[in-house]
Amino acid sequence: MTQRIAVLGATGSIGDSTLSILAAHPEHYQVYALSGHGRLDKLFELCQQFRPSRVAVPENKVDDFATRLAAAQIACEVVGGQAGLDDIALDPQVDTVVAAIVGAAGLASTLSAAKAGKRVLLANKEALVMAGSLMMQAVRDNGATLLPLDSEHNAIFQCLPPQIQQNNTAIHDASHGVKKLWLTASGGPFLNKTWEQMQAASVSEAVKHPNWSMGQKISVDSATMMNKGLELIEACHLFDLAESQINVVIHPQSIIHSLVEYCDGSFLAQMGSPDMRTPIAHALAYPNRISAGVESLDLYQLSSLEFIKPDLKKFACLKLAREAMQSGQAASITLNAANEVAVEAFIKQQVSLTDIALINAQVLDKMLGKDKSVAGHAAISVRQITELNDILMIDKIAREQAQLEVMACRN
């Protein structure tokens, strides 16, 4: 039976990798819908190649894009904005939603897909970082299937007992014997650099990842290890564990993608070449397997596998993420929002790479009431989050505060 796939965030790196696999297996998959935001020329080319039934673009681009498709004789419904993304996520013709929109912009459509009981292939970290409780509740209440695309979470999923994978049973049930999860991190381009070298780093240096080909924002997050911090928060929600049960270890070779430690002393690890097509192919085909077009590891050529404890002074963002998870959902929302603003400012060369952690810390302190100079925000730390609007309110305030911190760094 052919799966009808909606790829939300089709023009990004995850979208690229996903569509390459879908193109290689037309007998299994039909590209039913696509979405794009800034790279509409590329989205048009994808529409030419895959001939989707529906496509989502920014609200102010709907008419122009529809005219362009019609001129090319491509029969495709064009929908716009957040409402369009949600409508595709809810479309009864869609079997699987690939949630690959970067940042908070992908939150609402991912939540909509879960509420519609879809099979959701999750690459959007914010769905769990910002709305972990709401997202997992929506999955449970509506019979949705949630499969992680992050290489680390996908690796952990593969190393868990089948009854946890297939029945969504509690990972902390003693009978399963799971003791800890280990998230691996490459250490990024500054693993062997000093803090001072990080402070002076250019944007081009920060986005030059040693092992992975990724988008600009996630590459900067990898350089500061905020990416791993967000993945830690994500893993807590995805696998229903406390942050104390999840360790982070730097593994520069990026061959082991994560590990599960069991109570009998066993460690199960998932290994493979550092290529996002592997976890994407796994999630698309689960519980079966398909070719991902990835070259196999040559075990004879692996001279060593290193494991290093992270330096939390140099990679302060990782420490902030763990503290945010301890403080509750509002802190995670705040940290994610502040980080998006700070990373954008770094990419625009308005702040330094090391300013990102400083901005994040200051926004957390002020939003959660630790810094009394910002009146009225202390209640956010204990605010009950029951709906998407609560999340968006905290996100908005945190972004405004982060913009003030960026301005302070520039002065």
Swiss-Prot record:
Protein name as annotated: 1-deoxy-D-xylulose 5-phosphate reductoisomerase
Annotated source species: Psychrobacter sp. (strain PRwf-1)
**Keywords, in A-Z order:** Isoprene biosynthesis, Manganese, Metal-binding, NADP, Oxidoreductase
Required co-factor(s) are: Mg(2+); Mn(2+)
Q: What is its EC number?
A: 1.1.1.267
Output the InterPro entries linked to this UniProt entry. DXP_reductoisomerase, DXP_reductoisomerase_C, DXP_reductoisomerase_N, DXPR_C, DXPR_C_sf, NAD(P)-bd_dom_sf
Q: Which reaction does it catalyse?
A: 2-C-methyl-D-erythritol 4-phosphate + NADP(+) = 1-deoxy-D-xylulose 5-phosphate + NADPH + H(+)
GO BP, sorted A to Z:
isopentenyl diphosphate biosynthetic process, methylerythritol 4-phosphate pathway involved in terpenoid biosynthetic process
Record: residues binding Mn(2+)? D150, E152, E231
Q: Name one Pfam family in it.
A: DXP_redisom_C
Protein task: Catalyzes the NADPH-dependent rearrangement and reduction of 1-deoxy-D-xylulose-5-phosphate (DXP) to 2-C-methyl-D-erythritol 4-phosphate (MEP).
Give GO MF terms, alphabetically. 1-deoxy-D-xylulose-5-phosphate reductoisomerase activity; manganese ion binding; NADPH binding
Q: Which positions does UniProt annotate for NADPH binding?
A: T11, G12, S13, I14, N124, E126, G215
Q: Where does 1-deoxy-D-xylulose 5-phosphate bind?
A: K125, S151, E152, S186, H209, S222, N227, K228, E231
Q: Which SUPFAM superfamilies match?
A: 1-deoxy-D-xylulose-5-phosphate reductoisomerase, C-terminal domain, Glyceraldehyde-3-phosphate dehydrogenase-like, C-terminal domain, NAD(P)-binding Rossmann-fold domains
Q: Which family does it belong to?
A: Belongs to the DXR family.
Pathway, according to UniProt? Isoprenoid biosynthesis; isopentenyl diphosphate biosynthesis via DXP pathway; isopentenyl diphosphate from 1-deoxy-D-xylulose 5-phosphate: step 1/6
Please state what class of enzyme this protein is: oxidoreductase
Q: Which gene encodes it?
A: dxr
